[in-house]
């Protein structure tokens, strides 16, 4: 054995080095949060639960262009529309199968009027599979519930679009 190794062994230098690291780590600030009681900060680009937005006058934003349905790689979106008296289209059915959805965000990017968005809600577990089949009413309710946050997130992300 080399003399330096004997010296380290006698004076427990390897042990003291490890102990030094452990003591430093004890006094560092904690990185974890106490999850259901504390929530971490969410990015404005977070892809959570889907929502359909309305204009400030209460009219639905969706113009039934079906771009989101066409671009969805998982084919999770189904849209049906009818024609209004003035010639424009109205969405009669807007369904998203959340079991198929891969949360890629392509539907949100393709929408020309920011009608379909992915909101900040990540706590939407259910007890049955049927609850993961979102219809137009459920999506509009989500949009109404999260409108303030959604509008702020879109405004914050506007420079990156």
UniProtKB/Swiss-Prot annotation:
Protein name as catalogued? NADH-quinone oxidoreductase subunit I
Keyword set for this entry?
A: 4Fe-4S, Cell inner membrane, Cell membrane, Iron, Iron-sulfur, Membrane, Metal-binding, NAD, Quinone, Repeat, Translocase, Ubiquinone
Gene name linked to the record: nuoI
GO BP terms: namely: aerobic respiration
Q: Assembly and interactions? A: NDH-1 is composed of 14 different subunits. Subunits NuoA, H, J, K, L, M, N constitute the membrane sector of the complex.
* Cellular localization per UniProt: Cell inner membrane
User: Which cysteines does the record link by disulfide bonds?
Assistant: none
Please name the Pfam families in this protein's record: Fer4_7 (PF12838)
Q: Which InterPro entries match?
A: 4Fe4S_Fe-S-bd, 4Fe4S_Fe_S_CS, NADH_quinone_OxRdtase_chainI
Q: Which organism is it from?
A: Pelagibacter ubique (strain HTCC1062)
Family statement drawn from the similarity comment of this UniProt entry:
Belongs to the complex I 23 kDa subunit family.
Q: Give the superkingdom in one word.
A: Bacteria
- Domain 4Fe-4S ferredoxin-type: where? 52-82, 92-121
Q: Which PANTHER family match?
A: NADH DEHYDROGENASE [UBIQUINONE] IRON-SULFUR PROTEIN 8, MITOCHONDRIAL (PTHR10849:SF20), NADH DEHYDROGENASE UBIQUINONE IRON-SULFUR PROTEIN 8, MITOCHONDRIAL (PTHR10849)
């Amino acid at each position: 054995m080399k003399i330096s190794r004997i010296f380290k062994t006698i004076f427990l230098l390897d042990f003291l080095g490890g102990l030094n690291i452990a003591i430093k780590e004890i006094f560092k600030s904690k990185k974890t949060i106490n999850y259901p009681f504390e929530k971490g900060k969410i990015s404005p680009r977070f892809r959570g639960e889907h929502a359909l937005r309305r204009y400030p006058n209460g009219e639905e934003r969706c113009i039934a262009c079906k771009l989101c349905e066409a671009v969805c790689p998982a084919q999770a979106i189904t849209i049906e529309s009818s024609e209004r008296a003035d010639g424009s289209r109205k969405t009669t059915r807007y369904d998203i199968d959340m079991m198929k959805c891969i949360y890629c965000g392509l539907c949100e990017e393709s929408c020309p009027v920011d009608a379909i968005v992915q909101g900040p809600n990540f706590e939407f577990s259910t007890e049955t599979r049927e609850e993961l089949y979102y219809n137009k009413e459920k999506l509009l309710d989500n949009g109404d519930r999260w409108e303030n946050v959604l509008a702020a997130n879109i405004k914050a992300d506007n420079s990156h679009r």
